[in-house]
Amino acid sequence: MTQAVLVLDQRLAARADQADLLLPLTADERSVVRGRRRTDCGREVLLQLPRDGALQPGDQLSDAAGTARVEVTAATEALLRVRATSALALMQAAYHLGNRHVALELHEQDLYLLEDAVLATMLESRGLQLSRCQRPFRPEGGAYAGHQHG
């Protein structure tokens, strides 16, 4: 017997108890708070959340009755890891990628971005070391990430 689609329309204000289900989402999927998704065990859910900001790993969602708790997790994605021989070279790479509005995850020694052949060529031409990896992607929110239009 097929389970009914679980409609998630509530963001829980504080992290509650253990979640019943995990919902792995890519960075792009976390920015869209409406639509059909699948939990890690294959249960279909329908997001119908208020448009008040992107979802973050660790956020917990619920149905209107509060009978199900679903925790958002960061899904594994194909990424490029960028390393440089100096902090300045790494900052320059971040600057050039930022000019192209590329989502970046920033660390002291490296940058992560979604895999992209054109950007990989540009970065390699600047002398940066690239490696491909599969891991959750948690990009910076951007200058206006917390801004709400009212």
From Swiss-Prot:
One GO term (biological process): protein-containing complex assembly
InterPro entries in the record: UreE, UreE_C_dom, UreE_N, UreE_N_sf
Pfam family for this entry, one: UreE_N
Localization annotation: Cytoplasm
GO molecular function terms attached to this record: nickel cation binding; unfolded protein binding
Gene Ontology CC terms: cytoplasm
Main location: cytoplasm
Gene3D superfamilies in the record: Urease metallochaperone UreE, N-terminal domain (2.60.260.20), UreE, C-terminal domain (3.30.70.790)
Keywords: Chaperone, Cytoplasm, Nickel, Nickel insertion
Protein's job: Involved in urease metallocenter assembly. Binds nickel. Probably functions as a nickel donor during metallocenter assembly.
Entry's family note: Belongs to the UreE family.
Record-given protein name: Urease accessory protein UreE
Gene of this entry: ureE
